[in-house]
């Protein structure tokens, strides 16, 4: 069974990055499916072995996962708040998540979101009250403060392009 746990960990970690929580859940789920008469203690032992194997081979690193996921999410237009929340859901502790999102530029991320959704400076249609409410609500749902949302909403296209052209950390 330990060789199965090792091979399963190798397979999963070679496909994509995982957090400790994700690997533990995947091994637990698959062990219950594969070994019908396995007990809870054995399942936990297999999961712990797989996690230890991942750490021992430097294939499992929550800090690195948090940094990569943060950069990707920022490029996608996600707010600092949304990124942090998503990391915690994935199993990253709050302190590590806070460190990972410390350098996120919410203004830049909001401009990326505006470009993706054709809001604010990238708007292609005439602005009316309904559209204004929709755009501002969208920024709020994405986790941006009302100040950031309003700033991007009122921004000129040239200013938005300038924000986007600035280097990302």
Show which residues each predicted segment covers.
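An alpha-helical, amphipathic repeat domain used for nucleic-acid recognition
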Residues: 1-169
């Amino acid at each position: 069974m330990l060789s199965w746990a090792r091979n399963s960990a190798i397979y999963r970690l070679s496909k994509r990055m995982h957090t400790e929580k994700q690997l533990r859940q995947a091994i637990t789920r698959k062990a219950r499916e594969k070994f019908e008469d396995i007990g809870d203690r054995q399942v936990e032992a297999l999961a712990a072995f797989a996690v230890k194997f991942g750490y021992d081979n430097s294939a499992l690193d929550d800090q690195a996962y948090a940094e990569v996921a943060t950069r990707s999410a920022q490029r996608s237009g996600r707010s600092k708040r949304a990124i942090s929340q998503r990391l915690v859901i994935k199993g990253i502790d709050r302190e590590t998540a806070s460190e990972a999102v410390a350098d996120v530029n919410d203004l830049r991320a909001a401009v990326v979101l505006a470009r993706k959704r054709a809001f604010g400076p990238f708007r292609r249609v005439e602005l009316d009250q309904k559209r204004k409410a929709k755009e501002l609500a969208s920024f709020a749902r994405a986790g941006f403060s009302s100040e950031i949302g309003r700033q991007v909403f009122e921004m000129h296209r040239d200013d938005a392009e300038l924000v986007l052209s600035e280097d990302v950390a």
